[in-house]
């Protein structure tokens, strides 16, 4: 959840409410689709074919998530000057820069306003943007809320369509796999085989252990090295499975 929500808000620049809405819809469909996947398997495919189809869809979905596209872009306008906002890093290590020509300044945007990182405290607390602009040349030390404008350009041509395609593939994959994998495990044993309970115990331990390790590893790679690494690892994990 954390990786996906951060991916939506920091890479594609969805608002927090919009990102939570996308995640909620995704989570709801992940839980609902196994009902449809089970019905299709019972009537047409059989459990084994459904599991194979689900696994292929999950691998495709997670690898598709690794195609980031350009992501959203933000621009900052202060008075007559326009800057492109450049972001380096992810999560808590995310650093923002305002770039205009050869000028590149680290900034911080809060509800109070836009601050130039490293500015003098007295200037950073100033309430008059014009007065602050006179304190230092170039980027003002502090511009209060209302004295600047941030515009967001979303990656609707490539990145977002690929994102929703990937989520759709994952949802369909879970629908086929989750509803039928238990049936396949159960079919490995005769009805009264004493090993049956042990087999299901191993199965569920593997699921929970894999979920724990995958969450930690994918989140670490995604936040530390890049979104594509986190989602790509999930794809490799599904492929190996």
What are the language-model segments listed below?
Residues 18-19, 53, 192-206:
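Cytoplasmic loop-to-transmembrane helix junctions
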Residues 54-158:
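C-terminal ends and interior cores of transmembrane alpha-helices
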